[in-house]
Amino acid sequence: MNIGKKLLTAFLIVGILPLAIAGYLALSKSTHALSAQAFNQLSSLREVKKLQIENYFGSRMKMMEDIPKNLRFAGGLQSFTPAFKAGLQSPEYKAILSKRDEGLKIFNDVFGFYDVFLIDVNGNVVYTAAKESDLGTNLVSGPLADSGLAHAFQKSKSGTVFVDFAWYGPSNEAASFIATPLKNKEGVFIGSAAFQVSLKEINAIMQTRAGMGRTGETYLVGPDKLMRSDSFLDPKGHSVK
């Protein structure tokens, strides 16, 4: 290579190299800015969903403070307990059910619960709004003794409790429960009122995808790293089940 070509090559390298470096730095800066923007958006979405979930459960835990004072629960349990002993198909039980059912079911509609339970002091499920297979079972010695509902009943003897999502056979889906103790006029524990949190309500919060595009989604994960809501994009592969 003669000296002219060598000089031309050198000049080209000297001229192109700064442009290449400048282009790389600009691209790197742009990529970093886009990444930072994406992470900031994700952080904002996380905080919004966190607040929505906290408000959802907070309002329901607040509602639980009034349940022991609500006569339809303590009074309902005191009515259902002796009728239950006569049998679910007995005239006594059906009469109480006809009188009390609608007043208890309304809590499903107003607060979005899946089910409402009245449980006597011995752990018998004497009433449910949904009338699934858990109605009539005993939460101490029966097939649901290790279920979330049974744990909620046991823990509620000392106060209002929340039991995390786990598979619940009678509903054929994952369920969590909130329960609170019920007492008679003398202040003696007579059983519990329990409420099954609807998975649909949690999914409705987490699967609202405004501003996420076609591939964005949020879902709830518990401390055990298991799903607490279903994936919107892949509900079969990634779900609470």
Where are each of the predicted segments found?
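Intrinsic low-complexity, intrinsically disordered coil/linker regions enriched in small/polar
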Residues: 83-86, 128-144, 158, 184-186, ...
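Juxtamembrane extracytoplasmic/periplasmic/luminal helical "stalk" adjacent to the first N-terminal
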Residues: 5-93, 105-116, 121, 162, ...
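Short, flexible loop segments at the rims of nucleotide/cofactor-binding pockets, characterized by
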Residues: 93-95, 141-142
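Short, conserved clusters of charged catalytic residues that mark active-site
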Residues: 8, 48, 59, 98-102, ...
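Conserved catalytic core of Hanks-type protein kinase domains
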Residues: 67, 155, 221
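Extracytoplasmic/periplasmic ligand-binding sensor regions of membrane-associated signaling proteins
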Residues: 101-196
